Amino acid sequence: RLPVFIAAAAAALAVFSYLYNPRNANMIHSLPLDRRELYITNYVSGFVFLFVPELIAFIAGVLVCLANQITCIQYLFYWFLYMAGVSFFAYALAVFVAMLTGNIFAMPSYYLAVNYLWIGCMKMVQNISSLICYGVSDTWTSSQTSRLSPLDYLIRNLVMGVKYDKDYVQAVGVTISGGKTVAVYAVAAVVITVFAYFLYKNRKIETTGDVVSIAALRPVFRWISGICGGGLIALAVSALVLEYIKVNEFISLMIFMVIFGSICFFAAEMVLQKNFRVLCKKRIAEWAGFVAVVLILLTCFRVDVFGIERKIPDASEIEAAFVNMDYPVCVSKEQIPEVLELQKQCIDSKDEYLSVY
């Protein structure tokens, strides 16, 4: 899956490279073609770069199987469908990302960020919760929302393997999982393709060279840079400081989050403006709002507005339970109600435990 996404990004960059050079952009858009025709031509050209090699590999594989009297060629067809679906989605996403920027170096970075932004944010939130919330683990588990990080989700859920007989001696077939996932992403690719077209249709040529080519997304770029960049640095520095200095975790994280979040916020603005002079009344007011939102969110975690500390699942929702000491101890299904009662007791005794530890 990773090579497919890399090839998709390269193909999108190749066919839409004229968007990142002012001279080329003006020349291409001066041709007697409307943007719909340009978009379709370039889009199809880029996808052909991905699809044709897969088709050739499929045909070659079928010929090799037939030459060696191997009749189970349906697995090659499944592989071809899976790869075509993944390629379609990866390429559609790459084209969409290509429309968001006018900088050829920013596009690969955005493409990587889009593929891992959701899972990265969830892991960051989990680490913040474990640091300032009572009794919350820093272990993150994937869920259905992990589909919003497509590359990671496909790597973990699109699997092909060999099926053996009951004695594990002879291969009897091939197991494939993730077909529904590929179908969902293929449908999403159609929507993304249409959305990317409208972005291209309304794109201003003057934004060539800009890190963010859509004006409405520039505040989003600043805030994501501030929250995600500042949050990651703040977590790393807080963990380092707390290793050697005994200080309140919440106060430590709050201070570092404001400091590094502000640095990342204004650094993002410098990138957008291509200038170090970014302090103006409008931007300072926006920064003040950014700091206020950060402080409010951290305070919400601290006072458990979201009910993270108090959440206890029903016994019917639990497949397995573990008690972590020096090592995890697995609990039988019959003991799950006892574990839930123990969890409830730990929550009720929060103040007593915190006064000791």
Question: Model-found features: residue ranges?
Answer:
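Terminal transmembrane helical anchor/hairpin motif
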Residues: R1, Y116-L199, R203-A216, G231-M254, ...
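Long, hydrophobic alpha-helical segments
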Residues: R1-N24, Y43
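Secretory targeting signals
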Residues: L13, V44-A106, I119, N127
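Membrane-interface alpha-helices at helix entry/exit sites of multi-pass transporters
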Residues: D34-G46
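Central hydrophobic cores of alpha-helical transmembrane segments
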Residues: F105-W118, K281-V293
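Alpha-helical transmembrane segments
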Residues: T193-L199, L235, S262-K274
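Internal/C-terminal transmembrane anchor helices
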Residues: R222-G229, A268-I308
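Membrane-interface segments at or immediately adjacent to transmembrane helices
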Residues: T299-Y357
